Regions:
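Glycine-rich, N-terminal phosphate-binding loop of Rossmann-like dinucleotide-binding domains
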Residues: 87-88, 121, 170
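N-terminal glycine-rich dinucleotide-binding loop that anchors FAD/FMN and/or NAD(P) in oxidoreductases
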Residues: 50-69
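NAD(P)+-binding Rossmann beta1-loop-alpha1 motif at the extreme N-terminus of oxidoreductases
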Residues: 2-49
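Short acidic low-complexity segments
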Residues: 67-81
Length: 189
């Protein structure tokens, strides 16, 4: 099934995982909003200053700008997103878990009805269950997929279209939704 071009927000979108992914998705014609709390990096991106080296990132950034990629430091900017991708760096440290949980709460508060959330971050084992039991998640009829990032930093734009994509979901109908999205950006399912 061909997926129409969607509004996509990438949380942590200016980081080593999020920025290449955001640019790649925008280059496929989706309307992308990069959401990142790091104001300095967001301002540098507005001035076309990329925060790190990545093979082909400059090229994809130019393509993303042609497709009017948006930049924001506010989670509220996801309010029109059909797909919300979370790409935060994470670890088992209590501080990192609290940051991740806070971002997740912000996402659930601001996500529009029936939007689809893709977790690409490494997460604790109980995270999926915790999200699916969240009152806002249920009330808003959100969908959730765990699609871990498995690419090499610095080579992600080379590996994205060739690395098989793991899609962890609750049932077959949800699998189809997320598989169609990944196929729309030429990432193998």
């Amino acid at each position: 099934m061909k997926v129409p071009k969607s509004n996509v927000s990438v949380i942590g979108g200016a980081g080593h995982i999020g920025l290449p992914l955001s640019c790649y998705i925008a280059s496929k014609g989706h309307k992308v909003t990069i959401v990142d709390i790091n104001e300095n990096i967001i301002n540098n991106l507005r001035d076309d200053k990329l925060p790190f080296n990545e093979v082909n990132l400059q090229h994809y950034w130019k393509e993303a700008k042609k497709n009017k990629i948006k930049l924001s430091t506010k989670t509220q900017s996801i309010k029109d997103s059909e797909f919300i991708i979370i790409t935060l760096g994470s670890s088992s440290k209590t501080k990192d878990i609290k940051i991740f949980d806070k971002v997740l709460d912000d996402v659930l508060q601001n996500a529009p009805l029936q939007s689809k959330i893709i977790l690409r971050s490494t997460i604790n084992i109980d995270t999926i269950e915790k999200i699916e039991k969240n009152k806002l998640f249920v009330q808003k009829n959100l969908k959730l997929a765990y699609c871990p990032e498995r690419i090499a930093e610095g080579m992600s734009l080379e590996e994205l279209p060739t690395m098989p994509q793991i899609i962890g979901v609750k049932d077959d109908s949800e699998y189809r939704i997320f598989k169609d999205f990944f196929e729309s950006i030429d990432i193998l399912g």
